[in-house]
Amino acid sequence: MRGDGPPIRVGHRGAALLAPENTLRSFEAALAAGAEAIEFDVLDLQDGSLVLAHSDDLLEVSHGAAAGTVRDRTLPELRAIVPDLPTLDDALAFLAARPEVLVHVDLKLSTRLDEVADALARHGVEERTVVSSFHLESLAAVARLAPRARIGFTYPEDRHGVARHRVLHPAIRVGTRGLRATLPMRVVGMAARAGAQALMLHHAVVSAAAVERAHAAGIAVWAWTVDLPDELERMHRAGVDAVITNDPRILDSAPAEALATLRP
């Protein structure tokens, strides 16, 4: 959860800028680009299947192939549209065969959490997994059901799909500046309420003061979704423990002076 040098490279939905997101092909692209951890989203379908999908928007999940909703379809119906759609078991089998890779499961469901926990245990990846959500009840359930997994609290809740945009809208930038100013006073209580060992923070709300307070309380800080050099440089200066990015190669261009300032 905490890095001993440069921040942990976390591939966002695999490597969403290099291959279709939340697919095994995207996982492979992320690892080829130097990712040390893979983040992916888990969503539940009406037939009980757990699949890798960021939202209920079929246009997003099908990579633009079809419109509609996701959750009210069965796995065979979805795979007729998105042949490479992985299930949770598919993803964990891939990662179980790569024991050096950290696993980051981002919950897009609040039910069937026992099945998520069971899958982590069956594939032997629980101890190297962090499970994240903004939903406190879901995190509490996972902590009980998968006690060897780490818990990450996501902040702020991404109601407007901010993570999809490489450049923030001016109104959103103003809002995040306000959150960034107050966050240092809130990080410890926020993590405590969530029972979290890590805070998954949007890069726009991260500050050195927030990271310092989190670290003083033994809490890791992972920043999402960092795709631009200036964002990366600011995360280096703030001292975050992990960078979640759509293209892990961005860390190859990190300035040496920024790397040298990272705290252990």
Feature names for model-found ranges:
Residues 15, 42-44, 109, 228:
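Short, glycine/acidic-enriched loop or turn micro-motifs at the edges of active sites
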Residues 10, 39, 104, 244-245:
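Generic enzyme active-site microenvironment
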Residues 1-17:
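Long, acidic (Asp/Glu-rich), low-complexity accessory segments flanking structured domains
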Residues 27, 88-92, 113-118, 136-140, ...:
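Generic structural signal for well-ordered alpha-helices
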Residues 21-28:
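Short amphipathic alpha-helical segment that frequently serves as the phosphate-/nucleotide-binding helix
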Residues 85, 154, 162-264:
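C-terminal active-site rim and adjoining tail of enzyme catalytic domains
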Residues 29-44, 191-199:
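Catalytic domains of carbohydrate-active enzymes, especially glycoside hydrolases
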Residues 3-7, 46-49, 54-159, 172-175, ...:
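Metal-dependent phosphodiesterase/phospholipase catalytic core, i.e.
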